[in-house]
Amino acid sequence: MHTSHVLPRAALPVALGLLLASGHAGAQSNPSVATAPAPLSPAELSALVQQQALQIQQLEARLRAVEGGAVPLASAPAAATSAAPAALEQRVVAVEKAQSKAPKVSWSKGAPEFTSADGETVFRPRGRLFVDQSSTSGSDYGTRNLSGTEIRSVRLGAEGRYGIIGYAVEGDFADNAVAWKSVYATVDHTLFGQAADLTIGNRLNDRGLDGSSSTSNTPFQDRNVVGTLVMPQRGLFGVGLTERVYGKGWHASLSVAGNDLNNSGSDNDSLTWATRVHWNPVLSKDATVHLAAWAFHEEIPGGATGVLRSSAISGHFNDEIKIAPGTLVGTDRSNAWGVEAAGFFGPFWTSGEWGTRNLRGLDANGRYDLDHDAWSVGAGWFVAGAVPAYTAKAGTWGKVKVAEPVTSGGKGAFELKARYEDVDYAELPTGGTGNAWTLGGNWYLNDYSRVMLDVVRWKTDNRSGAYVGPDEGTTFNTRLQLVF
């Protein structure tokens, strides 16, 4: 409270002494000067002293800032203010020059991000933790009415950059196993005058709004059925090359990849060509419209597993509640495509996706040509504290920014959400059908953590597996999520 008074008082006698001494020395060293400068009036002298004191005070504050000092000016010895402004300026410049060469550290993403002084080298650890609880009731099969907890995902890794070369390495501990996820390098460049990057390695598919987004950012605990079922035999990831080009409100990608990094190496890889394009016809602070389409073609080796996938329609924990696709042997290729639409209007969002996959192969009955499809629609409303997060660069869900985090004394952000999704395997020889309504809410504690509730009302009608025929029930899923 007294900082602004101590320095002027300390500087006053110093400045007066310097002025008088310089005036006296000047008079003695220049006796031949006919006209001496007019003496300063008391008011002018006082103004000059105050100006000098203010300059010293500003330099001291600047020096404390760059040195990180915390000693209040009032507690410092008065003699510390007697240094001449020029000497103090030199000291500040020297400290600032040394500090400019030191690496910078930012915590804006929840973990320390280290950046070299020239900005060319960046490194930060990254990871996530999903702790889930699930409870199901209402099924006609008692073995489907399960309750329990699981650590859905513990993911640890790092990402960084050396100039135009970026990288990410990440492993996931889930389902009592360890699996590699993102393991790739990128090279930034330009293509047709637009920003672009080439990915080499194991990276998440660019396929659908939910399918292209991390589950750390999707509004629901699990991706919709288009993202989880209408996919290549290799799954969500694949080792290969992906070229992406970015424009204002659009992007396009083309990739070619084999199986993901966790392939056992005991058989041939599948080979998948894929593309996706998104466009934002409306892109502003108050409203954004997302339109997109995607497609892939894959060549599947003989004896490959995982060509068809069961839909965990009630959430990840309960493995008994799935829509069974049945058995299909001899598939040697597939083609798939889908469309997306979404809108973000202030605190509201809505989205819809549809996808279909055509399977071709040879079984005991000869050649076949069969389809299966899925679709989903959803909507949400941020009641308070934030707005929907969307990344226009890649056409994906983004990370929600909380205005008043709980960790800073605020209330966080609250979101209400609803989704309907439908799966149809009926054209396959023994494929089932099913659908689900999901209602819930998310409480965002800060930019890095949230508590989620999904209440799923599901129906299945399987023609194969342990639970044949119509069945329905309700599943309550909760999650504590931490991502950095």
Q: Residues of each region from the PLM?
A:
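Bacterial N-terminal signal peptides that target proteins for export
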Residues: 2-12
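Outer-membrane beta-barrel pore domains
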Residues: 2-4, 40, 142, 187, ...
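Bacterial N-terminal signal peptides
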Residues: 11-21
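N-terminal periplasmic/intermembrane-space "pro-region" immediately following the signal or transit peptide
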Residues: 25-128, 383, 387-401
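Glycine/serine-rich loop-strand microenvironments at binding/catalytic pocket rims
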Residues: 29-32, 78-86, 157-174, 240-267, ...
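Acidic-residue sensor for enzyme active/binding pockets
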Residues: 44, 60, 67, 89, ...
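Secondary-structure boundary/capping motif
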Residues: 53, 58-66, 91, 150, ...
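Outer membrane beta-barrel
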Residues: 107-301, 372, 376-408, 415-417, ...
